[in-house]
């Protein structure tokens, strides 16, 4: 089952869905993408009915903008809970707390940020929305003085950012403060199959311009990168999938490795099957 949303539906995705003939939710984006195609589009009620007949079947999307619709319409199954587990960075940290017993993180309300004593934080650290998207609202803090600068920047950004994405994609009431994870960063697209086994689709090295760069601009990959890291990342995904009971579930995970077998998960984004679409 597929739900299409802005910002982009690629030609490859349209061609693939034309060949598959799987249910596609009727909305403005789907009608625009398939206006000259015989591909069937399901009304909301028919789509929900098809999902309820088999709640274990995969639901894929090209955009996190679909999360709000899923939360409101597919709530008879377990999908919204699993999406929320990974969209909420605080909930995810709780899930893997014993995997990283010495890792510092703290969740805090937006209005309470001014009351945080920066001297009690593991500087450098990062502060970001608990439910975030791309690098919006994310700030590196490299000194105690830089803490207040980050808080001031967040306050200035909040109202502007709220107009950009649905609330389920980006929530700015709660933030999480985390210690910085050192090492080389990678982005991994994967999915869990019907038996709960993780299948890695790609591994991308994430390059940054500087230590305080948090952008998503530059990624690289190669046979060497994939061969070097595949098995370690596979084992990590198996453990996370077991804890979250994931089946027929696509994810995008960002992870850092220190080159000595120690892996630190930055975050996991759910539901969107990015690779090749």
Where are the language model's segments positioned?
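Glycine-rich phosphate-binding loop of ATP-grasp-fold ATP-dependent ligases
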Residues: 125-155, 185-187, 208-225, 277
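ATP-dependent carboxylate/phosphate-activation module, predominantly the ATP-grasp catalytic core
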Residues: 182, 189-243, 269-277
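ATP-grasp fold ATP-binding core
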Residues: 96, 121-141, 160-183, 188, ...
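Conserved ATP-binding module of the ATP-grasp superfamily
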Residues: 102-104, 144-182, 239-243
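Conserved metal-phosphate-binding beta-hairpin within the catalytic cores
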Residues: 241-275
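Conserved N-proximal alpha/beta basic substrate-recognition cap immediately N-terminal to
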Residues: 30-120, 133
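Short, charged N-terminal beta->alpha structural module
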Residues: 1-38
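Anionic group-transfer/hydrolysis microenvironments
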Residues: 64, 130, 176, 180-181, ...
């Amino acid at each position: 089952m597929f739900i299409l949303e802005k910002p982009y539906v690629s030609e490859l995705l349209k061609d693939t869905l034309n060949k598959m003939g799987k249910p596609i939710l009727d909305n403005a984006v789907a009608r625009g993408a398939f206006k000259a195609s015989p591909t069937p589009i399901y009304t909301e009620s028919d789509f929900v009915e098809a999902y309820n007949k088999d709640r274990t079947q995969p639901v894929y999307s090209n955009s996190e903008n679909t999360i709000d619709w899923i939360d409101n319409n597919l709530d008879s199954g377990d999908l919204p809970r699993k999406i929320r587990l990974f969209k909420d960075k605080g909930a995810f940290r709780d899930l893997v707390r014993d995997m990283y017993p010495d890792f510092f993180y703290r969740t805090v309300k937006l209005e309470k940020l001014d009351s945080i004593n920066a001297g009690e934080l593991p500087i450098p650290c990062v502060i970001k929305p608990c439910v975030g998207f791309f690098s919006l609202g994310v700030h590196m803090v490299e000194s105690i003085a830089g803490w207040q600068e980050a808080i001031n920047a967040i306050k200035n950004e909040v109202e502007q950012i709220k107009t950009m994405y649905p609330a389920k994609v980006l929530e700015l009431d709660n933030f999480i403060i985390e210690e910085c994870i050192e090492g080389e960063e990678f982005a991994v697209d994967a999915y869990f199959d019907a038996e709960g086994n993780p299948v890695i689709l790609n591994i991308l090295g994430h390059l940054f311009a500087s230590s305080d760069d948090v952008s998503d601009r530059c990624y690289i990959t190669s046979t060497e990168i994939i061969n070097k890291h595949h098995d370690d990342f596979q084992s990590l995904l198996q453990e996370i999938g077991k804890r979250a009971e994931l089946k027929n579930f696509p994810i995008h995970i960002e992870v850092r490795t220190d080159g000595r077998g120690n892996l630190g998960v930055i975050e996991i984004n759910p539901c969107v099957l990015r690779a090749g679409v």
